[in-house]
């Protein structure tokens, strides 16, 4: 989920411990669709929704999950994996990606505190090479995987949905298609660390739409965080754009000129309503606040955007608050 300049990855590996996808180069259906657009605008403020990623590794220990401020609409738990929520005996509280919580009871209490204030809490779900197989996540089938995610996220933890982090490695398309180009997309080329949306991969998302998203019967959020430069992007949008409540672009560091190019492609080629499109602010990096605030205030030529997501809110709270204020004020 952490998208940065490709050239800076080696530096960030030392600083952050890993370098997941960021932009490689930061330079120069009617019924379902109608329901989907209404869902996407329901929470929006003057410049859309504010979505906060909260990384659970224990950083900034004085800023708890429950301290997420008002005017944040949704929080995505990031770092902590669904299998730790499934079996709470394997990762003790206060360790690893449970570093932000003394115990699972502490986690539960803080989740309820946010929900009592009207803030939705979602679980991040990473795509995985196993999604390209008949046994995603080691489950017997895509249907079994979808059932398990529903059981963990909805039944056990009473969360408000999931967000798919689509950027991880697996088999690439063969042949790799020609990239549309910077002027068309706001990106210079494919992100080579991503994987193809094979039929099996798409079937995993299809199973998740039974329980999450605009066509599910329970009002649970289905979001995606990815990039137009990800190999799977176009096929996912072709098949599921109407199912997502919000579509987050990991557009970290981009200025308004560049995000407008992204919006042009998303609304034109991908036929995504502008009101679903959420753009990314990289609080963790801490170096692009002026651009992020400008993008947060920006109204695209297509009309109001969906809003902004902030990665990771608890890494740099003053930076994150500035972006939130730009979205909501």
UniProtKB/Swiss-Prot annotation:
Provide the leader sequence positions.
1-39
Q: Please list the GO biological process terms of this entry.
A: carbohydrate metabolic process
Identify the glycosylated residues. 88
Look up the EC number in the record and give it: 3.2.1.96
As for subcellular location, the record says:
Secreted
- Kindly state one GO CC term assigned in the UniProt record: extracellular region
Domain of life according to the entry? Bacteria
* Active-site residues, Swiss-Prot/TrEMBL: 167
Q: What class of enzyme is it?
A: hydrolase
Q: Which InterPro entries match?
A: Endoglyc_F3, EndoS_F2-like_TIM-barrel, Glyco_hydro18_cat, Glycoside_hydrolase_SF
Pfam family of the protein (one):
TIM-barrel_EndoS
Supply the alphabetized keyword list. Glycoprotein, Glycosidase, Hydrolase, Secreted, Signal
**Gene3D superfamilies to which the protein is assigned, alphabetical:** Glycosidases
Q: Which GO terms describe its molecular function?
A: mannosyl-glycoprotein endo-beta-N-acetylglucosaminidase activity
PTM comment for this protein?
Carbohydrate at Thr-88 consists of (2-OMe)Man1-4GlcNAcU1-4GlcU1-4Glc1-4(2-OMe)GlcU1-4[(2-OMe)Rham1-2]Man.
| Similarity remark | Belongs to the glycosyl hydrolase 18 family.
Q: Quaternary structure?
A: Monomer.
What is the documented function of this protein? Answer: Endohydrolysis of the di-N-acetylchitobiosyl unit in high-mannose glycopeptides and glycoproteins. Hydrolyzes bi- and triantennary glycans. The presence of a core-bound fucose greatly augments endo F3 activity on biantennary and, presumably, triantennary oligosaccharides.
What is the name of this protein?
Endo-beta-N-acetylglucosaminidase F3
